[in-house]
Amino acid sequence: LLAYVLFCTNVHYDLGDDVLLARSFGGMVGGVFESFNYITHTFLGWLMHGLSLLWPGVAWFSVAQVAALWISAYAAVLSAMRAAQRLMLPAWCGWLAAVAYLLGMAAEGLTSVTYTLTAAAAGGAAVWRLVAVDWQAGRKAAVRGALGSGALLYAAYLLRAQAFLPSLCLWVGALVALGLMKKAPWRALGAGAAAVAVLFGVSVGVRAVQLSAPERASYLAWQAARTQAVDYGGLAAAEAEALEAAGLSPE
């Protein structure tokens, strides 16, 4: 992957949302260590806030993404090898499949530290982990395996809920496919899915409460206006009304 980065990509820092988030969490915007933003989940915001207070000057948002990328790659390889062994194939067959996945489909996500692609990499690893679960080992083992897969899916959700949705669809599709192909009993699949649903249900509820707070209304309205004016078509194509709502002007 490092060779891919050096020879096949243009290595540079780009002023994208990731840089803005790293700066805001790091106290580089107005000298305030932020604990909330409209993109990442509340729990991740609290974690970044605490780490920045304890060890300031570190780009913790980028560190968290690098950790998520490493864990996602490791989980994909390990899960592919376990799945191969369950199919009575040599472990190297799973390793080869995982390497093909990492270099073929996941290379861009693993070598671009952007929260959207990091979420995609974590979601892909979650599907690998789901397929590798031994669903015949009983309900407790099924729940543990599903939660292990759900943790990777949860990492994608914490980074960016919108980017996590495609991974969620693939995860649910893999769950249904396991049942239809009779690779796993439906009761075990249901127990695993229910455990993951509880985890996400609590997180969605916490996020909804935070977003509904009156003090967030003006900030969220400004972000919505800015997104409409700038992100969809650029400043040149933005209407004057949209620019005015975001506090900008055509000039």
Which ranges hold each PLM region?
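Extracytoplasmic loop-helix module adjacent to an early transmembrane segment
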Residues: 2-37, 48-53
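Short hydrophobic/aromatic helix or loop-helix immediately within or flanking a transmembrane segment
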Residues: 34-59, 63-68
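Aromatic- and kink-enriched transmembrane "portal" helix at the membrane-lumen/periplasm boundary
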Residues: 58, 95-121, 154, 158
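Transmembrane-helix motifs of polytopic, lipid-linked glycan transferases
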Residues: 67-87
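Membrane-interfacial entry segments at the cytosolic side of transmembrane helices
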Residues: 87-90, 139-144, 180-197
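Membrane-interface alpha helices of multi-pass inner-membrane proteins
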Residues: 144-160, 172, 195-202
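Transmembrane-embedded, aromatic-rich helix segments that form part
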Residues: 161-177
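Juxtamembrane membrane-water interface segments immediately following transmembrane helices
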Residues: 165, 188-251
